[in-house]
Amino acid sequence: MELSQYHQILSLLNNFSNKDKISVIECLDSISELRKQMSVLFNKLLKVALKNRNLPMVKFVCDNLEKIDNKAITLAAKYNCLEILKYLHEKGLDTTNHNYSALSWAARNNDFKMVEYLQHQGSDIRANDDEALRWAALSGCLEMVEYLQTQGCDVRNRNDFAIKYAARNGHFKLVRYLHSQGSDIRTDDDYALRWAARNGHLEIVKYLHSKGCNIHAYGDSAIKWASMGGYLEIVEYLHGVGCDIRIDNDYPIRWAASNGHLEVVEYLFSQGCDIGADNNYALMWAKKNGHDDVVEYIVLLKLLKLY
């Protein structure tokens, strides 16, 4: 709204008559629209302030907002600022709102002080099927997981989510701890081993295999995914313990080539994989994806009549 519009409104209100009724209504509508726009602007500013953990800016914005969105509490927890979270709570925001997601973020960030504060304010440590513990496991926060377990959280909730994602994200110490606490390492078709292989976590792959996980689960997906990701040591290990490197029409070498993993391609070829499988899939996709070193290697093999 322009400054001239404010003067127009003041003039109309000071000299109001029936003939000015429509003009006044239009001006009031403009004010209403402006307030909406300002509210949107201040809410955007609040998110920026929270992300930057800027308490003075948070206070300024809150002082200029008629109503503060309760999601601000969750964002304060997400961005790991207890001081701001306390301030927002003092302003009347509910720490237990939005399915206790503030507590889950505090646990994921390994922030014990915030977790304890939220507990003291009434947050349910076991809300959403032990989401706090599950998120802590996702981030590899071993001590937080141990603490939450002492508070009654179940490490096996949601189909052993904790150990599956601890393995997937490479948190070896946590994987061992959760296994010692009764988590099922083989749940969901050996998800833990398969995703550890996919993400390159050799130590976890070895551990899980030693504890009875099936390296062939889900159609030998462990070696297929490790090849696709270029994790040579995992490919070598899995091949050494019996995985079929020629599974699904030489899937491992085809996808290693497609993704540009020359060392894996060289190893798999040396172990008997058919680099020309599926109508020269490896060469075709290495070319399409711009992996010149792989293309040169395959062309050389062809020139030497090695396949």
Curated annotation (Swiss-Prot):
Pfam families: Ank, Ank_2. Gene3D superfamilies: Ankyrin repeat-containing domain. Keywords: ANK repeat, Repeat. The keyword Repeat applies. It comes from Acanthamoeba polyphaga mimivirus. SUPFAM superfamilies: Ankyrin repeat. This is Putative ankyrin repeat protein L59. Signal peptide: none annotated. ANK repeats lie at residues 41-67, 68-97, 98-127, 129-157, 158-187, 188-217, 219-247, 248-277, 279-307. It comes from the Viruses.
